[in-house]
Amino acid sequence: MDLLIILGICLSCVVLLSLWKKTHGKGKLPPGPTPLPVVGNLLQLETKDINKSLSMLAKEYGSIFTLYFGMKPAVVLYGYEGVIEALIDRGEEFSGRGIFPVFDRVTKGLGIVFSSGEKWKETRRFSLTVLRNLGMGKKTIEERIQEEALCLIQALRKTNASPCDPTFLLFCVPCNVICSVIFQNRFDYDDEKFKTLIKYFHENFELLGTPWIQLYNIFPILHYLPGSHRQLFKNIDGQIKFILEKVQEHQESLDSNNPRDFVDHFLIKMEKEKHKKQSEFTMDNLITTIWDVFSAGTDTTSNTLKFALLLLLKHPEITAKVQEEIEHVIGRHRSPCMQDRTRMPYTDAVMHEIQRYVDLVPTSLPHAVTQDIEFNGYLIPKGTDIIPSLTSVLYDDKEFPNPEKFDPGHFLDESGNFKKSDYFMPFSAGKRACVGEGLARMELFLLLTTILQHFTLKPLVDPKDIDPTPVENGFVSVPPSYELCFVPV
C-alpha cells in the first residue's frame, strides 16, 4: 500500500510538472483555477451547465482565463471585447479549429467545420461559392423555403388543432431545404428513410447537450466504455450511409456539362483534380462536407424554431403583436417574403430576441491559435484551444438590460424601429462563423411568420407555467419537450 501511495504521489508530480511546463515553458497563459492531476479543472465545472461555471470563474479571474480539460489547457474568452478582438480583429490567428474528440473521430480533419489550415480554407471557399451559385442567400432559396413552409402548413392542418409535439415537423423543413440544395430533391414527410434521418438528427442534438458527451470530449478514452456516445456514433453511421447512397446515385447519373446540385459540382471538381497528389477534393471530404452542412443546417434551425414556439406560447402578448404586424403588412392571401422584414420592425426584433435568449450554442465550437501569439499581455502557444463564450456577449447586461428576460425591446429603439446590435452573434463571428447564418435567419423569419399567419398557438397549460429553460445546457442548449395546438385562424 505504501508503494502505491508513493507511486501515486510521483505520478501526480509528473503530471503537475507537465502542466507547469505547458503553461510556463513556451508561454505565459492567463490565470485560472489550479488544475488537479489527470482531471484538470473538471471538478470545478458544472457539466450540466458549463455557462454557469464560466460566469462564476470570470468574476474571479477576469475576461480571459485558463481552464484545464483533463491535461489540456484551453483559454476562455469571456465578454464582448475579448471575443471580438480574437475572432474579428485577429481572426486569422484564431482561425484554427480546437480539439473536439466526439466529432474529430468522425470527420478525421475533413469537411468545413472541424478541419483547419489549407484544407479548411480550400473546402470552405469552394463550398461557399457553390452554395451561393445554387441560390443560398438569394431569391432562389427564399422561394424554396416558401414552398417548404406551405408543406409545413398542410402538415399542421392535419393535426386538426389537437395537441401535438412539433419536433418532427420542425426538423423536416430545414432538412428538406438542405436536401434540395445538396441533392436537388425533397422528401415527403412520411418517407421512411427521411423519418429515420430526422430521428438521427434529433437524437444526436439531445445527446450533445448531455454531461457524458462533455466528459467524452475531455477523456476520449471513454470511447472504449459503454455510454451514450455509442448511440451518437451509431446514428452518425446511419447519416453517412444515407449520404453515401445519394452520392452514388449522383455518380451514376452525372452530366459534367449540367451540374444539378452541390454533389454534382463536387464530383466534377474531384474529376478535374484526380491526378493531383494532394487534392482536397476526395470522396471522404465530400461525404464529410455534406454531413457538416446537414448537421449545421438542420439541428440549429429546427431547435431554434422549437424554442421559438415555446417562447411565443409563454408570451401571448408578444405573439399577438407579431400577428397584428403580419396582418397589417402581409395579410392572409400571399406568403411572407424577406422584403417584408424591413417593414416589420417588431417581428424582426422578436426573431433576434429569440436567437439571443435561446443561446443555442453557448460557447461556440473551440477555436485554436494558428501560431504563437501575444494576447492581452499573455503568451499563448500555437495550437492552444480557445473557447469564446457567446453567452457572455448575448447576455451582456450593458447592451441588453435585464438579459435574463425575454424582451423584444432589446432590439427596438425609442421610436419602435428595429435596432441592430454588434453583440448579436448567435452564429459566432469572424472567419469561423456559421456558413449557414443567412439561410438560418431566412428560415426563421419565413417559417415563423407563415405559421403565425395561418394559426393561433394554443398552449395546454397556463402560459405562466411554461418553462423554456433548456433541459440540457452543455455544448448545446436542448429545448424541453412540449405539446401545443395549432388552431387555424
UniProtKB/Swiss-Prot annotation:
Stated induction or repression of this protein's expression: Constitutively expressed.
Q: Where in the cell is it found?
A: Endoplasmic reticulum membrane; Microsome membrane
The entry assigns this protein to a family as follows: Belongs to the cytochrome P450 family.
The name this protein goes by in its record: Cytochrome P450 2C3
Where is it found, in Gene Ontology cellular component terms?
Answer: endoplasmic reticulum membrane
Question: What's any GO biological process attached to this entry?
Answer: organic acid metabolic process
Task: Please name the taxonomic classification of the source.
Answer: Eukaryota, Metazoa, Chordata, Craniata, Vertebrata
A single Gene Ontology MF term assigned here is: oxidoreductase activity, acting on paired donors, with incorporation or reduction of molecular oxygen, reduced flavin or flavoprotein as one donor, and incorporation of one atom of oxygen
Q: Which organism is it from?
A: Oryctolagus cuniculus (Rabbit)
Q: What is its EC number?
A: 1.14.14.1
Residues at which heme binds:
C434
List UniProt keywords, sorted A-Z.
Endoplasmic reticulum, Heme, Iron, Membrane, Metal-binding, Microsome, Monooxygenase, Oxidoreductase
Membrane topology listed for this record: Peripheral membrane protein
Q: Which cofactor does it need?
A: heme
Q: What does this protein do?
A: Cytochromes P450 are a group of heme-thiolate monooxygenases. In liver microsomes, this enzyme is involved in an NADPH-dependent electron transport pathway. It oxidizes a variety of structurally unrelated compounds, including steroids, fatty acids, and xenobiotics.
Catalysed transformations (reactions): an organic molecule + reduced [NADPH--hemoprotein reductase] + O2 = an alcohol + oxidized [NADPH--hemoprotein reductase] + H2O + H(+)
The UniProt entry, under InterPro entries, shows: Cyt_P450, Cyt_P450_CS, Cyt_P450_E_grp-I, Cyt_P450_sf, Cytochrome_P450_fam2
